[in-house]
Each structure stands twice: as C-alpha cells, then as structure tokens.
C-alpha cells in the first residue's frame, strides 16, 4: 500500500504504515459514499469498508504542503467539535502556531464581524465534516478552503481536501493530527532531518478522559502507607517527630513552697467579712424624677 504519486522524499516509512494500522486508521464504516470509493481498499465480510492507507498518507502530505504554503501560521484555523479531537487540535495549534477552536463552534465566527470570536483565516482544518458542519458552511460563504478528516460515510460537500481515515476513534484521530503536524514542521524546516524521529510523543495527541486523569492525580497525591495496615503504616506514613513519647513529664514546682499553703488566708479569711460592707439598697429613699 505504498503511495506511488509522491516524490520519493515524501514516501511513508514502514513505521508510519505500522502506526496507521495500529491506530486503526484503515477501519471505515459500513456505509460508503460515492466520493469515498477511490479511497476504498476492500469490504470485509461483515460489511465494514477498509480504507487504503497509501491514499491516507498521500492526503496527509498534500494537506501538510497546503498548510506550510501559508506564510502566517496563525491564518490556519483547526477545529474540532468532537471530544476525541479537541486535545489533538490544541496540541497541533501549540506546535504549528495555528488557531484552535476546541469544542462548540460559535455560529458567525467567520461571517459576523461584530462577534468577539470573529476570525478571518485563510484555511481551516476540521476533524469531522458532520460535527463541524457549521464551520464548513460558513467557510463556504467567505471562500475559505477546507481540509477535513473524512470517513467512508462523511459528507464531502464544500470540502476541498479530504483525508480518508477513521475519524471516530481516539487513537486514529490523534495519530493523523500528529502526523500532519510533523509533516508541516518538516516542510517548514523546523525538523531538519526526515529520518530522525520527532521528539514529541504521539500520546500527547490522544484523548484522555478527565475522570481518569482526576483519579490518577488522587492516587499520586496519596501519602505513603495510607493503604497499609498495622505498625508498618504508622512507621512509613507517620514518621516520629523526634521526641520521646515515653519520657516522663516535668514536675510542676510545689506551690506551697513559694506562696504558702492554700488553706492559709493571706490577711483575713473572706468568710469573716473583713472586706468592705455591702451597701443597703433598701435603706436609701428613691429619688423622685423631675419628669
């Protein structure tokens, strides 16, 4: 399945083909659109269409050459309303300098200049033509070219360059975006040697469940020995503070030696009434008010 319509410098390596197969980029859907027939390899017995990986690589290189031809990287807008592609477009934008719209696309972002999210890109790249239909529709109004990751059943209306791949799996979406970013950087000269591997791992482009990340963070923040039992948990999780717990406390000084016995009265006993006599409130006549 090696591509034959590219210069030899752009040919895919065996590792690239293995990665595309491992990420199941060749697994299409059971429905087949008329525009996806040239990219079909075969149809399995269960009705699932298999995509030609060689055609996928050709379109990845073609899309990368189009993106690299734009002088200002920020004039490229990458869009993904599908959750599996949101992390990928953010990483692609961080590595190539493009603008990213991850999540819901605000209607009017390309046509209504009054909105805060108004943009005027020269090229947009979408993850799924079906979920990103609003962005493609607005791009057609203002003559913006569209590159899209298309499955065998994806609509291709107003799509200028379709990359045939599985756009429903988290690994296939992340791998295609990773390869697209790598080819763009190679064409720009950021990666000088095409034989050397890119130092960015493809795992960074894969979707990660926020709940799973939160659970991993909680596990990392746990103190050592919390889940253990017995003396070992106390020794490992609660180290000694440095003092001796069995040491006897210091004795308080005898109060009688310094101040005398408590039973002895200093001066006179308070029971004898030596203090000032209490005034008799009843003996005093009530003062008449002038009111």
From Swiss-Prot:
Keywords: Cytoplasm, Ribonucleoprotein, Ribosomal protein. GO terms for cellular component: cytosolic small ribosomal subunit. It comes from the Eukaryota. GO terms for molecular function: structural constituent of ribosome. PROSITE patterns: RIBOSOMAL_S2_2. InterPro entries: Ribosomal_uS2, Ribosomal_uS2_CS, Ribosomal_uS2_euk, Ribosomal_uS2_euk/arc, Ribosomal_uS2_flav_dom_sf. Its main location: cytoplasm. Residues 255-291 are annotated as: Disordered. It is found in: Cytoplasm. GO terms for biological process: ribosomal small subunit assembly; translation. Pfam families: Ribosomal_S2 (PF00318). Belongs to the universal ribosomal protein uS2 family. Component of the small ribosomal subunit. Mature ribosomes consist of a small (40S) and a large (60S) subunit. The 40S subunit contains about 33 different proteins and 1 molecule of RNA (18S). The 60S subunit contains about 49 different proteins and 3 molecules of RNA (25S, 5.8S and 5S). Interacts with RPS21. Required for the assembly and/or stability of the 40S ribosomal subunit. Required for the processing of the 20S rRNA-precursor to mature 18S rRNA in a late step of the maturation of 40S ribosomal subunits. This is Small ribosomal subunit protein uS2.
């Amino acid at each position: 399945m090696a591509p034959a319509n590219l210069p030899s410098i752009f040919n895919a390596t065996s590792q690239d083909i293995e990665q595309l197969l491992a990420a199941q980029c060749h697994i299409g859907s059971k429905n087949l659109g008329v525009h996806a027939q040239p990219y079909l390899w075969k149809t399995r017995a269960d009705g699932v269409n298999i995509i030609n990986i060689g055609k996928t690589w050709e379109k990845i290189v073609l899309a990368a050459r189009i993106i690299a031809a734009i002088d200002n990287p920020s004039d490229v807008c990458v869009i993904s309303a599908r959750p599996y592609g949101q992390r990928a477009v953010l990483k692609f934008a961080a590595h190539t300098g493009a603008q990213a719209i991850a999540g819901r696309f605000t209607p009017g972002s390309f046509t209504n200049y009054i909105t805060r999210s108004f943009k005027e890109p020269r090229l947009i790249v979408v993850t799924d033509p079906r979920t990103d239909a609003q962005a493609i529709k607005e791009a057609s109004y203002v003559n913006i070219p569209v590159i899209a990751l298309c499955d065998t059943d994806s609509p291709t209306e107003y799509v200028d360059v379709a990359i045939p791949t599985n756009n429903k799996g988290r690994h296939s979406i992340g791998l295609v975006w990773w390869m697209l970013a790598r080819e763009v950087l190679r064409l720009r000269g950021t990666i000088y040697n095409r034989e050397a591997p890119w130092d960015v791992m493809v795992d960074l482009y894969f979707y990660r469940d926020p709940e799973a990340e939160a659970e991993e963070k909680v596990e990392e923040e746990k103190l050592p020995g919390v889940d253990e039992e017995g003396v070992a948990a106390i020794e490992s999780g609660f180290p000694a503070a440095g003092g001796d717990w069995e040491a006897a406390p210091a004795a308080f000084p005898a109060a009688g030696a310094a101040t005398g016995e408590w039973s002895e009265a200093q001066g006179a006993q308070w029971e004898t009434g030596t203090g000032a006599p209490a005034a008799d409130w009843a003996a005093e006549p009530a003062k008449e008010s002038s009111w």
